[in-house]
Amino acid sequence: MACLGPSAQVPELPEKNCGYREVQYWDQRYQGAADSAPYEWFGDFSCFRDLLEPELRPLDRILVLGCGNSALSYEIFLGGFPDVTSVDYSSVVVAAMRARYAHVPTLRWETMDVRALGFPSGSFDVVLEKGTLDALLTGEQDPWTVSSEGVHTVDQVLNEAGFRKRTSRLLGLHTQLELVLAGVSLLLAALLLGCLVALGVQYHRDPSHSTCLTEACIRVAGKILESLDRGVSPCEDFYQFSCGGWIRRNPLPDGRSRWNTFNSLWDQNQAILKHLLENTTFNSSSEAERKTQRFYLSCLQVERIEELGAQPLRDLIDKIGGWNVTGPWDQDNFMEVLKAVAGTYRATPFFTVYVSADSKSSNSNIIQVDQSGLFLPSRDYYLNRTANEKVLTAYLDYMEELGMLLGGQPTSTREQMRQVLELEIQLANITVPQDQRRDEEKIYHKMSIAELQALAPSMDWLEFLSFLLSPLELGDSEPVVVYGTDYLQQVSELINRTEPSVLNNYLIWNLVQKTTSSLDHRFESAQEKLLETLYGTKKSCTPRWQTCISNTDDALGFALGSLFVKATFDRQSKEIAEGMISEIRAAFEEALGHLVWMDEKTRQAAKEKADAIYDMIGFPDFILEPKELDDVYDGYEVSEDSFFQNMLNLYNFSAKVMADQLRKPPSRDQWSMTPQTVNAYYLPTKNEIVFPAGILQAPFYTCNHPKALNFGGIGVVMGHELTHAFDDQGREYDKEGNLRPWWQNESLAAFRNHTACIEEQYSQYQVNGEKLNGRQTLGENIADNGGLKAAYNAYKAWLRKHGEEQQLPAVGLTNHQLFFVGFAQVWCSVRTPESSHEGLVTDPHSPARFRVLGTLSNSRDFLRHFGCPVGSPMNSGQLCEVW
């Protein structure tokens, strides 16, 4: 019996059944398919999932025959199988599917007749067909007695898909398979001859054989071409030139406020992780990996989560002492509630406390205290009340809705939540803006707990820190680094003058924010309404499994990384990446030698620091050692039955891990990103750059792509992170990772003059009429500019050593131009206006468009290779250069 899944309204049927065989019918039927709901023959993927998934592997190359406008291909992708090609002989529906799923580049859509597929032999591991043969056989009079024409049609499809039956009785001494193979051999011989003729023509036209005609080169050339906008001059707007086509083909997916290369790769990585965790044959010798699966499965237990509703959080609030919003509360327990909320459950009301390397003595860890306590992304949302009235109203509505879901009454809940919001506004008033915190020498203050107590006496710091870092014994002389003494002093005064009931409501509100993502769908729906106002997202269609992968990554990221690395990471990639870093470092150091503004003593120290930068590629070694991996998560209890309790256990466990670090030196094995993360970073206290396995893939890096693209992709990322060691903050740390003045005054003054040019340049850029903050983004802008220059110089050095490489076919770009296009296309991006505003006020990076335009307009090499004249939009005539 057919499984009846959700589907679109039944469309107009053909006059006769045989009409199903005609492409004209399908072209007419699929007019407007890009905007209509999928139509599922026999049912959707969920109806067949139990049958299919045991037969599929994550890296299978899957072909879907007669895809129509079904969501099957996309659902297979979401199921953890990223390599899916779909064919249909209606060009109308193929165009619609390309548009609908343009945000998923691994899904391919081709116009083909299933009776005459155009793929090379061996192109696929799995072929799926759901209703296509039925459509082809609608002309049959009797379903039990198929005509010879019908048999021939089925034969054609099976043959094209790679299946044949033996019929030796009909064909005498030779089986049909043998005859087919003989025919295929003749066909391949003809194709080979045709290829040789074509190549001969190509070689005749291109005597130097300078064009790369490998499959990889042809594929990447196609992707580059479809991303370009040839209607725009590269000297007018290089971002639009490089990304205009990509932007047209990539409308924002539902539920997303932004979409770019990083999001796309993370979705692919998540699909792989899903398959690994849901594999019915999952069997690991590592307890940490087993915990990872249990945690993930507990997150998927939606029925259990819905059944519990808000009760787990209500019970937790009662255990802590109650909440004035929802019922009785203990009025004399400020310190006890603070210890529970900020200590046991790791929320961050008023301030945040953590253990990390001491910036001025990087071989030892120390307690650190910094400003915190705001729920909205930035203080600007609270203080610019006229511009952000919609957001503040939506936030108050959200606060009220959660309070009522937890047992509050409508009138009293809104009033009490309004008081909490007013307290957050007062916190925003004393919070120091990020662009005023860039000089770490100025904001670093080391003191004892006794001195901290004198600075901020509204709470007992020794009691709080001793509870947080239990079982360690702390005394009044224990050193603490405070970032922002003025802030803490004012917070203390704010606590003293605030009503106890408001303080209690604010503290418990911080706990509620921390834990509601582990509760039922009502809390999720409330958050979605706030996010729609804050980021402009439409209602999220994010599958539950994706949410659970992200949660698992947060909780057990390195155990998850162990599974990811073993399934996907090629050790050769690590060796190649290390070689590229060496080349880029050499190019950076060579450029150091040509800087006219830097004195010799500072230059030598800078070279020594560059030499000392430690690079970490792929993953930390301990994750592949089961015992070492298990030790990392020893003490973290994970059950498959209670997602909420797993999250509480995680907060408590992380507090214990933090306490354990205080008396130990910092470890290089302690990464700040998990291996599956699509990103990279520089850490000044270790003077190290880290490139997780997740980013070492296309479009950043592919071993069989032209070097121009690899240097323009991952090469610029490497140069970017290396340059962070010498941006306005990184340059304050020496080669050992210690915050100390090591620059000569004259060079420091010259550096500041050069960075002032960058700051002023980027401050002129606007998004939707709102200016960028050139001070806030200064470090990232310096790194973008320096990274591009170092990577391009490294590419030129590679060419000098290895000679010119072949060019890509059809793109019409030299390899030097291709380097810059490759760099720009990494940053192709779309986002909502609300998300763009949020980025401007919170993100230390410039918007993607200006990461391209700002950087390239300062590049002499770019301007030369594209011939941009002075006075053109890409060449103002004034270049800002630091490194």
Swiss-Prot record:
Residues 211-883 form the Peptidase M13 domain. Isoform EEF1AKMT4-ECE2-1 and isoform EEF1AKMT4-ECE2-2 are expressed in liver, kidney, adrenal gland, testis and endothelial cells. One of its GO terms (biological process) is brain development. Binds 1 zinc ion per subunit. GO terms for molecular function: metal ion binding; metalloendopeptidase activity; methyltransferase activity. The keyword Transferase applies. Zn(2+) binds at residues 720, 724, 780. Inhibited by phosphoramidon. Disulfide bonds join 212-217, 235-868, 243-828, 299-548, 757-880. Optimum pH is 5.5. Inactive at neutral pH. Its cofactor is Zn(2+). InterPro entries: MetalloPept_cat_dom_sf, Methyltransf_25, Peptidase_M13, Peptidase_M13_C, Peptidase_M13_dom_2, Peptidase_M13_N, SAM-dependent_MTases_sf. PROSITE patterns: NEPRILYSIN, ZINC_PROTEASE. It is a single-pass type II membrane protein. Converts big endothelin-1 to endothelin-1. May also have methyltransferase activity. This is EEF1AKMT4-ECE2 readthrough transcript protein. It comes from Bos taurus.
